[in-house]
Design a protein with these regions (language model features):
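Basic, polyanion-binding surface patches
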Residues: 1-202
C-alpha cells in the first residue's frame, strides 16, 4: 500500500520556501583561534562556529574539523585562545581560514604578533586583537564533520586603548567583525541597549 504523503504545513503560495536541514544561524562572530603544541609550534585558525555556553562559570565553545592543523594542537594541550576580530583584521581573518599552517607561517605572512597568555602554558594570544579570551578545554564532543571543544574561560585580555574613564571597556568601538552566509560584515549602528524595550519613557 502506497504511503500517503504528509500534507505540507507551509503554504507555498505565501512566498515561503522549505530547504533541507542546514546551518543558517547567522550572523556569527568570525574569530581567530590561536593555539600551540608542546614543542612550541603555534598556529592561527579562523572559526565561525563559536559562542557562549554558560555565564557562570564562564564557558564557550569552538567547533573544528579534525583535519585542521590546529585541531591536534588543541587536543594535545587542552588550550586555545579566542581572539576577537575587527574590520582592520578582516583580510587576515579570511586568509587564516583558507590557508593551512602546515604550508605557511600565518603569523609572519599576516604580520600578527604573538603575546603571552596570562593563565595558559602553551597557547599565545594575538596582540592585534582587541580581546583575547584564554580557554581551557573541559570536554570534546565528536559530533560529525566538526568536533566541539567545550572550554572554561581562564582569563580575558583587553586592549587598553579602548578603556574609557571610569574603567568602562568600549568593545563596540573596536570595529568588530561578523560573518554571515559567506560574507564578512561590520556591525553598523547601535539600535538599542539591553532592556530598552521595557524601559519606562521619561
Amino acid at each position: 500500500m502506497e504511503k500517503r504523503k504528509e500534507k505540507r504545513k507551509v503554504d507555498m503560495a505565501a512566498g515561503r520556501q522549505v530547504w533541507r536541514p542546514g546551518n543558517m544561524l547567522y550572523p556569527l562572530p568570525a574569530v581567530m583561534v590561536s593555539a600551540a603544541d608542546k614543542a612550541g609550534n603555534a598556529n592561527i585558525l579562523t572559526v565561525a562556529w563559536t559562542g557562549t555556553v554558560c555565564s557562570d562559570p564562564a564557558m564557550l565553545y569552538i567547533s573544528v574539523r579534525p583535519e585542521r592543523y590546529t585541531y591536534h594542537m588543541i587536543r594535545e594541550t587542552g588550550e586555545f585562545v579566542v581572539n576577537l576580530t575587527t574590520e582592520r583584521l578582516a583580510y587576515a581573518t579570511d586568509w587564516c581560514g583558507v590557508r593551512s599552517g602546515r604550508d605557511v607561517d600565518k603569523w609572519k605572512e599576516m604580520a600578527l604578533t604573538k603575546g603571552a597568555a596570562d593563565q595558559l602554558v602553551y597557547a599565545p594570544v594575538i596582540l592585534e586583537s582587541p580581546v583575547n579570551i584564554e580557554c581551557r578545554v573541559t570536554e570534546v564532543k565528536e559530533l560529525g564533520s566538526h568536533h566541539m571543544f567545550l572550554a572554561e574561560v581562564a582569563a580575558v585580555q583587553v586592549d587598553e586603548r579602548y578603556m574609557k574613564k571610569g574603567g568602562k571597556f568600549e568593545l563596540n568601538s573596536t570595529g568588530l567583525l561578523a560573518y554571515s552566509h559567506g560574507e564578512y560584515l561590520g556591525l553598523g549602528k547601535e539600535l538599542g541597549k539591553f532592556g530598552w524595550s521595557v524601559k519606562k519613557r521619561k
